[in-house]
Amino acid sequence: MEALQHQPQNITLEQYEQFPEDYRVEVFDGAIYNMSSPSQAHQTILTELLVSLRSYIKEKGGSCTVFPSPFDVKLNDDPLTIVQPDLMVICDKNKLDGKRCNGAPDFIIEIVSPSNPSDDYIRKLY
């Protein structure tokens, strides 16, 4: 994940919402970070985990929902922090507003990429 040359450095939610839908970024403490496209191996792992989690929740009669990335999670307003974990489970439907999850999901999975392990192990430990 590389920092974009984008102003202002302390981006607001209103500015974030003006980005095109296919503009893949995360915002940490108001700073914008570009997200690279996932690899085939990454997507294969994501799909297997998604199917397994969804099946397990249904089998146990759970009411939680599994969401794959890209799906925004807003963790903070000022400074803005919006992330897109690779996979998340959300049980509290009140956190969902039709656009994103507001607050921490109940469970997240981040698939570590060889191209950016420091981001996955350090910055993304929100």
Question: Which role does the model predict for each range below?
Answer:
Residues 1-126:
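Gly/Pro/Ser/Thr-rich low-complexity, intrinsically disordered segments predominantly at protein N-termini
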